[in-house]
Regions:
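Long, charge-rich, low-complexity alpha-helical segments
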Residues: 258-291, 336-399
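Conserved SAM-binding strand-loop segment of SAM-dependent methyltransferases
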Residues: 101-114
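Conserved alpha-helix/loop element of class I SAM-dependent methyltransferases that forms part
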Residues: 11-52, 67, 71
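A short SAM/SAH-binding and catalytic strip from SAM-dependent methyltransferases
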Residues: 123-137
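Conserved class I S-adenosyl-L-methionine
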Residues: 153-205
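Conserved SAM-binding loop of SAM-dependent methyltransferases across substrates and taxa
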Residues: 61-77
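A short acidic, Gly/Pro-enriched loop at the edge of an enzyme's catalytic core
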Residues: 115-125
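A short glycine-rich, Lys/Arg-flanked "PGG" loop and its adjoining helix->strand segment in the class I
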Residues: 138-150
Length: 399
């Protein structure tokens, strides 16, 4: 099975990337946005005078590697990054992307994440879209924990079942039909069948999926992968706990907030609430989040600590502040979620003061907001923005 997976990524490195485009754009996302790493792994208060030792486990064509290396360079912070992947074709693309950007401090290794500890001890591990492709995912979780330095953590993405409806029956059918065929032949045969699917087919009805439309590599990874499983929230949390990890948080908490969908029975625990929200939502196709060592379980950054430095992520703080001051309720649409931000006009002055360098205490002083007013307003801001992945805490820009 491992040889089939390797053959797939040698034939179709994923995701499809053109290194020449590094001259004109930086692909960012979750996990491994550097602000998120600080927020979820280090409580928003990492000592950035120390180099960040990073393992990108299953680095593919380099999205996480390039994002993190470039953001560290932009912030003037030191990083020692190890890229690890089975595919030499994927590695070649990642190396060229780094070369085009002039990024240094990267060690490229061809190998398995099951041997992660052989390559050192790491403060942060990225493992995006890999663990669900292992024959024994638990072995992968344990192998990464063995490579984790004290106080460190991991950013992960694993597939979720409900937003991928229609995928797995097709995968099973194609695996039987095309057994023994080379990747190129499998792809051509599958495309012919897909062209004839009835309009009412569950896969065609699933508007959350798009990889099969983007490229040959995307089609193959979605529908022809030889080793693929999905984790619902309960299974994922059980897996993390069983392998020595603790869930720090998902990057989009609103997706897992049962209270946004219905009244919450008092007897439900945290995981039960998230699991029910996942089922009611029905559109979550990946779980993206961060985890720390179970024996070092700790919370993510929170506004209760006024020494932390907030960042508005994904949009301009000034633009958001202007909209809030005008009484607008900006629309949000991502991850299967459609919502509107609802903030009082008084919150605008606090949002406008967020510059990635001032602490909450300094923002309160600069805006003349008393402690009680600050607490009330900021809790609203944190819930509205933080739950939608738009607010994190990090000291990376503070000198």
């Amino acid at each position: 099975m491992v040889s089939e997976v390797r053959a797939q990524y040698e034939a179709y490195p994923y995701p499809t990337r053109d290194p020449a485009e590094e001259k004109t754009r930086l692909i960012t996302g979750s996990p491994s946005h550097v602000l998120e790493v600080d927020h979820f792994v280090f409580g928003g208060a990492r000592d950035w005078s120390r180099p960040l030792r990073v393992l990108v486990a299953g680095g593919g064509t380099g999205d996480a590697l390039i994002q993190l290396a470039q953001q560290m360079k932009n912030a003037g912070r030191a990083a020692e990054i190890t890229y690890l992947d089975l595919s030499t074709a994927s590695r070649a693309i990642a190396e060229e992307r780094a070369r085009v950007r002039g990024l240094g401090g990267i060690r490229f290794v061809t190998g398995s994440l099951l041997n992660a500890a052989e390559y050192g001890e790491f403060d942060y591990i990225d493992c995006c879209g890999v663990l669900h492709h292992l024959p024994d995912p638990a072995a992968g979780f344990r192998a990464l924990l063995a490579a984790l330095a004290p106080g460190g953590g991991m950013g992960f993405m694993v597939y979720a079942p409900y937003g991928r409806s229609g995928v797995y029956p097709l995968q099973e059918a194609f695996a039987t039909l095309f057994d023994g065929m080379v990747p190129e032949a499998r792809l051509n045969a599958a495309r012919k069948i897909m062209a004839g699917l009835p309009e009412g087919h569950p896969f065609k009805a699933n508007i959350n999926l798009g990889d099969h439309k983007d490229s040959d590599a995307g089609f193959y990874d979605l529908l022809l992968h030889s080793q693929d499983r999905a984790f619902d929230v309960t299974t994922l949390c059980d897996m993390l706990e069983a392998t020595g990890w603790h869930l720090s948080g998902f990057t989009m908490p609103a997706l897992y907030d049962l209270g946004r969908l219905t009244e919450v029975p008092d007897h439900l625990g945290r995981v039960e609430r998230m699991a029910l929200a996942e089922k009611l939502n029905g559109t979550i196709k990946t779980h993206v989040g961060y985890a720390v060592r179970g024996s070092e379980a700790r919370g993510q950054g929170t506004g209760r600590n006024r020494a932390l430095i907030p960042h508005v992520k994904g949009l301009r703080a000034a633009d958001l502040a202007r909209a809030v001051a005008q009484g607008q309720s900006p629309k949000l649409s991502f991850g299967g979620l459609r919502a509107r931000l609802s903030l009082p006009k008084e919150a605008a002055r606090l949002i406008a003061a967020v510059d990635g360098r001032r602490s909450l205490q300094e923002i309160a002083q600069a805006t003349g907001t008393d402690p009680i007013g600050m607490g009330a307003l900021w809790s609203r801001i944190e819930r509205e923005l933080g739950d939608h992945g738009l607010l994190v805490y990090s000291s990376i820009l503070r000198r």
